[in-house]
Amino acid sequence: MIVTPASIKALMTSWRKDFQGGLEDAPSQYNKIAMVVNSSTRSNTYGWLGKFPTLKEWVGKRTIQQMEAHGYSIANKTFEGTVGISRDDFEDDNLGIYAPIFQEMGRSAAVQPDELIFKLLKDGFTQPCYDGQNFFDKEHPVYPNVDGTGSAVNTSNIVEQDSFSGLPFYLLDCSRAVKPLIFQERRKPELVARTRIDDDHVFMDNEFLFGASTRRAAGYGFWQMAVAVKGDLTLDNLWKGWQLMRSFEGDGGKKLGLKPTHIVVPVGLEKAAEQLLNRELFADGNTTVSNEMKGKLQLVVADYL
C-alpha cells in the first residue's frame, strides 16, 4: 500500500468502526450503583446537591453545608492508551492484525468506569467522603438537633464479624436519582491519531501513533446509602447489614427511609450469593426454613472488585 493521506483516512474509518464496536459490545455494571454526571469543567463540586429542597430536607442542612465548606469536589482525569503501527506494515499491507487491537482499545475504554467505581468500594475503608471520614467508617457524626448542633453521635456503616479475614460484601440503596457513588464524564472515549508523514515521531521511529483518550472521574456520594459487611456471606450477616441501613437517621433523629436494593460481591462470592438470594429453602439443623431474603436484592457480581 502506498502511504497517502487518503489511504490512512480510509484505514482510520475502518479502525474507528472497530473501536466503536468494542465500546458498544463491552458489558458494564457501574450505572447500576453510580449516579452518572455529565461534567463540563475541570472538576465538579457537589455542594450543588443542596439546591434540591427535598434532598436538603432529607440529609439535613448541616450535611449540605459540610459538602460546600469542604469544597467536596471530584477532579476529572485524562486517561489514554496508545498503539504504534509500523510504517512498514502500512507499505506491506500487513494490517489485518490491528482490527482486534482497536476493538480491544474500545472495550478497555468502555469497562474503565467499572474499574473506577468498584475500586471506590474496595478503597472505601481508607478514602474520605464529604464529612471527612472514610466512606466506610465507624465514626460518621450525626447530631441530635435538626440544625446540626449538640454532641455528635458516631454512626457506623460497617458490619464486622470477629476474626474475619475474607472479602467483604456491600449493600447499597440505589433506588433514588442520587446514588451512593458518582461517576462523572468530561469527554467520552475517542480515537485520535498522529499520522502525518512529517510528524517527528513518524520520522524518528518509523511508526504512526493511534490512541484512545477520555476524561472522567469517580467519587463518593452519601455514605448513608452504603453498608460494608466484613463477614461471611450468610443470611444472618445479610440481615445485620440490612437492619443497619434501615436504622440510619439524619440530624435531629429524622428517619431517612433507606433500604438496600443491591448487593455487590466479588467474583469469589458469586456462588454463595446466588444460593443465598435464589434458594427457596435453607437447611436449619434437622429441618428446612424459608429463605426470607429471596427476591429482596439485585445481585451485582463485580468483575473489578
Swiss-Prot record:
Coiled coil: none
Keyword Ribonucleoprotein listed: no
Keyword Membrane tagged: no
InterPro entries: Phage_Mu_GpT (IPR018774)
Induction of synthesis: Expressed in the late phase of the viral replicative cycle. Expression of late genes is activated by the viral late transcription activator C.
Pfam family, one: Mu-like_gpT
UniProt keywords, alphabetically: Capsid protein, Host cytoplasm, Late protein, Viral capsid assembly, Viral release from host cell, Virion
Purpose of the protein: Capsid protein that self-assembles to form an icosahedral capsid, about 54 nm in diameter.
UniProt subunit comment: Part of the immature prohead complex. Interaction between the viral portal protein and the viral protease I may give rise to an early 25S initiator complex. The scaffolding protein Z and the capsid protein T should then be added to the initiator complex to yield immature procapsid. Host GroEL and GroES are also essential for the correct assembly of viral capsids.
Protein name per the record: Major capsid protein
Originating species: Escherichia phage Mu (Bacteriophage Mu)
Gene of this entry: T
